């Protein structure tokens, strides 16, 4: 299970924080050991009494060191005996100076080396006229004054945040949840109870030091310097608290009221009432019902309770959940409005990602969920965990659309993080689906209306070894309609799920996308000013489309290659989905070598297991069958497992694009020059890029092909007569092991090229001006289904209309086809050139079969 980490500290962007200096020195030195000066007796006695109840998690994880010789004063958010003792223990644990030993010459004028920004209120709330205390810290004012008097003094302030019971242990009981950390400043007794119940889950966050001397050197008046330093520290503590436990959440009712009170919703209500001829009050109630149907009902106690439950569930059905690259995200995220945009493979994605974020000390986002999941009991629990529900289709319902947009705008303006799946639904094939830009558009418009905090899109790849929905996906891919979700089916399936093992899950954080950077590139005319609600700049749609594709590309660039992915790549390349054990080991070894020696990106992760361990693991989770034979064991996948395995091959198909291209070129050709191989690859690349969300430019893809060639030559898969562009590359003529492995690598892209040739063949056969894009899609699907029946069995996505639609759209973008006034597709001789290029890749028999089965459009009978 993921390790429980507390959040890394955000980097302050203020002038004072950025002026941290660790290169200078001071005449004063601070002892780093407690042996020379002992802590007060009361602190030692109380510390010993409290020690059994405390278990500290220190951030940053590595030992904190401030060893440049300058004195340290710790800054707490508020005073309190428990906080003081916890800080003292944390300093002893990290071998830092004790906060209970005063500095030389005592610049704080206190018998200690820490201060707090605010004191827990001890005023009597029953006395209405009692005034609060001072608005600034006397200790901080004394420290600044000491620096003005003594030029040699240079103290470092180290902000320290303390959170007790942010994630109570499962063993600590449900009562502990009531006393876990929140936004309220609590009294001494409640704080003591929190320590007794949740002290073993205490997080102590040390921040980088702030130089008081450099702050004074800015030359501000004394009062302004004090106010500015306090503001910087308050901002820091607020950001850390938001990162750990989330923003101070408003109630669901307040959020709904705010949505209904916006100008846009009021205008939409009036317009809808006028169109329908109804009273304003009736239409207002309709809008209110929409808002209540959408809104989340975020509840920290329910979230903490769900953590207890799902920890047991994940431990039961999964062999671990691995999280990669989350630390770099935690360094970047503070100060941003974060939008999590994960891949969508399973209903488990919702709960799994929330669980991982919570375990990593990150506040849960508000999650967009389909209204189909708003089931009795389940829907309520999901709302309590931050889900808000939207309808699958909102086209034509202007009032609902505006209510939803305003709800999202309220979340963005309130600083809540969001999570949504831009594919619109779960992928049934294992590929990333073409993105839908609706939620991105709402997020972008909300930001442009109130550009307060920068927005950060965080792509996330979720990889499984076995799918809980595997059986239902098989039914849907075979043509059965999707079954409607129901609470009874859910409860009926729970025992079945809990009895099975689903392998390991990997969650990879991709490279984040800063919205401001995208706007600077695509909308340089926007200068950060707020836009009106109805204002839609010309660049808005293109920016949304760019963001959507960029997110999908970054998700693919953070893929994880697990044992099942590697097995699928190897076994599905053979006609009977079977290999001898030695051949399978060799093929897996080659795939891993390609991934490790030619890395796709620095965020792709590859299983560390050996091929032998991979095979054993697949047998353990009942994916692989071993057939014993005197000449050597054969390993195979049968029946439904073979179809499901294509899902896991498609997860990582993009990682082998360049190597599969090179291998395809030698499947039906024994000899080819480097320059021809690269030229054809660059010509084919736009279509592969559109389908697989590849990150390279055409020149970068050409370089990648060159690197693949060099690797294949080193491995003996290809023979090279020289290193010049015109020098031929050849493969062996006989059926050697090298030829077998080369053919296996080529298989992953073979079906894509077959689909491309089917499309071009049907266009050419029917002639220009005959078929519309939708008619062409339908004919392509029919031809692909027939080819699958006649030529060889293929994966169900081979005749997926969406893949043909994407290829046709790319043909239009490249102006290889274009519509006439009747929306029929026209083309010229360039399409014939593309058809000739396909002869290099596809065999003569296959090309002939495709040309023969390519259907013609039904023509009207002559009158």
UniProtKB/Swiss-Prot annotation:
InterPro entries: GPAT/DHAPAT, GPAT/DHAPAT_C, GPAT/DHAPAT_LPLAT, GPAT_PlsB, Plipid/glycerol_acylTrfase
Cellular compartment(s): Cell inner membrane
Enzyme class, spelled out: transferase
Reactions the enzyme catalyzes: sn-glycerol 3-phosphate + an acyl-CoA = a 1-acyl-sn-glycero-3-phosphate + CoA
Residue spans of biased composition, Polar residues class: 12-29
Name by which UniProt lists this protein: Glycerol-3-phosphate acyltransferase
Membrane topology: Peripheral membrane protein
